[in-house]
C-alpha cells in the first residue's frame, strides 16, 4: 500500500482526506456508513462557549448553482463536546480537529484551552463568526480583529492553530497575512460564500435567516 501520509502543521495525517467542519457533525453521524479510521482527520462541527440552538428553519435552500445553508452554529457547547464526544472520537483511529467560534477574543482563548485539554490534535479558528465588540461584524472582515482572534486562540492552544478565512472580503490575502502575523500555523480556505434565494411568490428570502 502506498504511503499517503501528509504533514499538517507538524501533525502527521495518514492521508490528506479531512472531513470538513459542518455536516459531518462529530463523526458519530457517519460511522455506520464509513470507517472513520480510513480518513486523515475529522474537523468537528463548530463549537461555542455556550450551547447554541442555531437558526430557525428553513435552513437549507437549493439554487440552480448549488445549495445554501444557514445552520447558525448549532452545537451543544464546548463543555458538552469535551465530556460526551471526545472520549468517543479518541477511539476513532484518526486525528481530531476542533473548529472553534467565539464572539470575543477572550472566548477564542477559552475555547482553545478547553479543546486542547480534551486532547484534540489541531484547532481550526472560525473567524467568520460575529465580533460583538465591533457591532457584529465578522472577525475575518478586518485585519485587526483577525489578529486579535488568532492571538487569543494561540494563547490558549497547546496544539497547532489553523485559521479558517472568510471569502466575503475585498482582499483575502490581506486577511491571510494578518492571521500569519498573529501566529497562525496554517490557513484554511474558505468558509461560506454568502448567498440568498428569493421565494418569488412570497417575495421574501427562502431562508429564515435571509442569507446562507
Mark where each language-model region is:
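Alpha/beta enzyme core
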Residues: 41, 57, 91, 103-212
